[in-house]
């Protein structure tokens, strides 16, 4: 017969074993969560918001971000921009939490980091490592960010195009969704127009098989110039006839500098844009979404984005 102490110790061991099994099962379930299949038909919109590392300097918590996403009228696509100086594994908790309430677009290489890549292989490895760590929580992969930017991207456009093509081929081989983000600007601000750059440097197979081409544009960087978006997307449709098109970044270049009212007006402008061409699918991906919208309960920008989305759903 077991003594009372032996019975207690045995019960403790059984309890510990049960708790360990529960933890491993839950952890494995989360890690092996099936990848969402957004694969929307051509006429289905993306409603995007962006999270970059700058939010981490605020007092906002991941749970507050999740709560704000859950309060949106649709399941959004959250674009998570990753910094090269941050370990890929460090993003896993954020990706996991966001993917439970939204589609996720990973941006492993922001345009601001492009000069840190000295060869195509190092750029592709960034995507290989990111895919290995985060693919279970990622629905879209941005293979090139502001791909045609001059100056801050470096002075070798063919090299930039080759890096994006390398990342595209890798992600495409995994049968995952590929996204290319181009950069629009006021007339004569760069040597080569966005459209001409894309025609010249993007390989033909990539033009045909990309899933999305989205356009980044900031009025703050372009003297408040307002593009003729109908013409822009007509031109893009001619270059990428089989690809879904939309806006890949918008908002302000400094969230502290501009008034709430100006942000509200800009948010309404973008999130209520019409369907310019057959393959237009929205996007938008407001850059400082966390800083402008979280906590969401009293955020006028959050309300403006949501009300505009609701209008397009009618």
What are these regions (language model features)?
Residues 24-25:
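C-terminal motif of bacterial Sec signal peptides marking the signal peptidase cleavage site
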Residues 34-84, 287:
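Boundary/entry segment of secreted carbohydrate-active catalytic domains
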Residues 47, 138, 246, 250-314:
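Substrate-binding cleft of secreted/luminal carbohydrate-active enzymes
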Residues 47-51, 76-80, 104-108, 139-143, ...:
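Hydrophobic faces of well-ordered beta-strands that scaffold small-molecule active sites
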Residues 62-133, 151-181, 226-229, 237-240:
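Aromatic-lined substrate-binding rim segments of carbohydrate-active enzymes
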Residues 102, 106-108, 145, 182, ...:
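Aromatic- and acid-rich polysaccharide-binding/catalytic face
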Residues 128-157, 179-187, 217-219, 282-290:
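Active-site groove signature of glycoside hydrolases
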Residues 164-195, 212, 242-255, 280-289:
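Aromatic-lined carbohydrate-recognition surfaces of secreted/lumenal glycan-active proteins
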